[in-house]
Amino acid sequence: MGSHSTGLEETLGVLPSWLFCKMLRFLKRPLVVTVDINLNLVALTGLGLLTRLWQLSYPRAVVFDEVYYGQYISFYMKRIFFLDDSGPPFGHMLLALGGWLGGFDGNFLWNRIGAEYSSNVPIWSLRLLPALAGALSVPMAYQIVLELHFSHGAAIGAALLMLIENALITQSRLMLLESILIFFNLLAVLSYLKFFNSQTHSPFSVHWWLWLLLTGVSCSCAVGIKYMGIFTYLLVLGIAAVHAWNLIGDQTLSNMRVLSHLLARIVALLVVPVFLYLLFFYVHLMLLYRSGPHDQIMSSAFQASLEGGLARITQGQPLEVAFGSQVTLKSVSGKPLPCWLHSHKNTYPMIYENGRGSSHQQQVTCYPFKDINNWWIVKDPGRHQLVVNNPPRPVRHGDIVQLVHGMTTRLLNTHDVAAPLSPHSQEVSCYIDYNISMPAQNLWKLDIVNRESNRDTWKTILSEVRFVHVNTSAILKLSGAHLPDWGFRQLEVVGEKLSPGYHESMVWNVEEHRYGKSHEQKERELELHSPTQLDISRNLSFMARFSELQWKMLTLKNEDLEHQYSSTPLEWLTLDTNIAYWLHPRTSAQIHLLGNIVIWTSASLATVVYTLLFFWYLLRRRRSICDLPEDAWSRWVLAGALCTGGWALNYLPFFLMERVLFLYHYLPALTFQILLLPIVLQHASDHLCRSQLQRNVFSALVVAWYSSACHVSNMLRPLTYGDTSLSPGELRALRWKDSWDILIRK
């Protein structure tokens, strides 16, 4: 034990002297820190921040679509559920993050464009993230052109065009999503190029993995902001697929190495984006747990998962529907309006407006509001009782039931009489015995559409059911047509015989449910008026809520097909349209989404020139005439695939869309054209100008062209920032096209 102690003491005694000697040798050498700073990048970043952050809080008023995004931010602040069909929730959450960082409490009435912001609205913070995204897009354009192996001059040219383009400046200075979408589009392209360029010298290195994963993350973020982001995602996937195909044919790589490359790309470019996309919705639904104004669009099960609203009404209802249950039946379709199966004492007219006759039976409709007349009693046809047995007898798939209207005690009926507005379908009514030769036909077979087995029980909220008429095989269906005044403009319900296949308009679910106990009608009416009071919670899984929300977002159609400032894709190319975003309430200061016409026209021309040159070179190479060296040709093809392909994918799909379109939808496509423009100019200088004199003349023309673009940008500055009040004459002078709508006070 003593010898061990002595050895330890000797070691401790030597250690400090050893460290001391090391420190002396270290201090004798100069301490050198090498920092590699790209001053071009620093300067472009600074200029981008200056142009986007300058007087960012101005105007202190709601500008154009801020009226919509502001509402969504307020919903996030108050944790209220909402549905926006324009895109996934990631972009909205980023805007809400700005509000949260600024301490916004969500209390502001977003009711009109031009409304002055109150003092509690942190407008600088709310507009900060779009402005930062717009500013950082400038240096990213520079880096993308460099990664394509073009010159610093071409890279600076692309960045300067992004810097001075008026429409990009305007869109990034407001609480809007396009600048954030463009940022992630460019980040996805830049990350993939850096990954691709590191492929040859350092595959599977830390940097290689970093850029590959960042590509997938950026693509997912772009799609998560707006569905338009999927166009750039497809662009990256397409180019990555071509490169992967080339890897498969590389004989220098082993089979295991090729498999590793393919798996890495599948994980980073497919698995990671899908995971992140689901994560965006998970966070979105976790934040928005309270009932809100858009609940009615969702299913009863979804509504019941939200705090308040339907959850407050339906909490703890009996799960299994039994004979004698009192229920409300909601149409699963929700189109054209969410509504419930309904009846009232009024009857169908004897003769309709078109001269057809009716059965004069009690009307059955679908009513878009909660009402006492929405309640029905599920009756066993073999028994007279309208109460639930003890123990309850659950209704199962395939059972025959009768539906008794709770307030009038008449049974749901259909027969071979044409419906009032859908003559090819049967009329649905509640049967009144007029003592004539029209027997009751009130038996319905229960068909549980989402059953797991043929003995499934009918469940509250969860089961989606169809009612098949026993006598005629017609299916109870919401036609969606609005009845005339005699039907109080309620929605028509019919018996569908011609197309009995599955359709949401034929599917119903129980929303409110109680076990009936009252034998007398007056007591039963009081029971129908009273709320349910049981205490069992009901939850919906995340994947079920995600699937429903995603489906609603994709299928929900905005009824606004016209707008004062809507435009067509053809008008975007030539900048024949603009959007008046804001007008000062007292002066002529105004903000417009209006592009730099020199840049837009030149960018379109560059796309045409590139396409013609590409096919010219391709035809000549087919004849074994190589105008370009192999490395220059590879650069030319990759640049075109990214820039021209990015423009086409972000532009051409709009010709197929049946929705209201605006000029700002073109901005993502425009950024790809802007990247292509200096590439075409450098190519012309390097490969088309044969002599030094031609190059000098061409360079002078390029400088003059850049100067004209800067001059136009400066002339349009008052309409870009809206901080200058111009006279009517000055405003007319800025109306360079008759189609531009410049606001002039009279």
Swiss-Prot record:
GO CC annotation terms, alphabetical: acrosomal vesicle; dolichyl-phosphate-mannose-protein mannosyltransferase complex; endoplasmic reticulum membrane; sarcoplasmic reticulum
Positions of the MIR domain: 318-381, 392-449, 453-513
Pfam family, one: MIR
CDD domains, sorted: beta-trefoil_MIR_POMT1
Membrane-traversing stretches: 30-50, 90-110, 121-141, 144-164, 176-196, 228-248, 266-286, 597-617, 636-656, 660-680
Disrupted gene: phenotype observed: Mice suffer of developmental arrest around 7.5 dpc and die between 7.5 dpc and 9.5 dpc. Defects are observed in the formation of Reichert's membrane that are probably due to abnormal glycosylation and maturation of dystroglycan and impaired recruitment of laminin.
Chief localisation class: endoplasmic reticulum
Gene3D superfamilies recorded: 2.80.10.50
Enzyme class: transferase
Pathway: Protein modification; protein glycosylation
Its membrane topology: Multi-pass membrane protein
Example GO molecular function: dolichyl-phosphate-mannose-protein mannosyltransferase activity
E.C. code: 2.4.1.109
Reactions that this protein is recorded to catalyse: a di-trans,poly-cis-dolichyl beta-D-mannosyl phosphate + L-seryl-[protein] = 3-O-(alpha-D-mannosyl)-L-seryl-[protein] + a di-trans,poly-cis-dolichyl phosphate + H(+); a di-trans,poly-cis-dolichyl beta-D-mannosyl phosphate + L-threonyl-[protein] = 3-O-(alpha-D-mannosyl)-L-threonyl-[protein] + a di-trans,poly-cis-dolichyl phosphate + H(+)
Protein localization: Endoplasmic reticulum membrane
UniProt record, GO biological process: extracellular matrix organization; protein O-linked mannosylation
Residues of this chain annotated as glycosylated in UniProt: 435, 471, 539
Keywords attached to this entry: Endoplasmic reticulum, Glycoprotein, Glycosyltransferase, Membrane, Repeat, Transferase, Transmembrane, Transmembrane helix
Record PANTHER family: DOLICHYL-PHOSPHATE-MANNOSE--PROTEIN MANNOSYLTRANSFERASE (PTHR10050), PROTEIN O-MANNOSYL-TRANSFERASE 1 (PTHR10050:SF51)
Entry function: Transfers mannosyl residues to the hydroxyl group of serine or threonine residues. Coexpression of both POMT1 and POMT2 is necessary for enzyme activity, expression of either POMT1 or POMT2 alone is insufficient. Essentially dedicated to O-mannosylation of alpha-DAG1 and few other proteins but not of cadherins and protocaherins.
Family indicated by similarity: Belongs to the glycosyltransferase 39 family.
Protein name: Protein O-mannosyl-transferase 1
Species annotation: Mus musculus
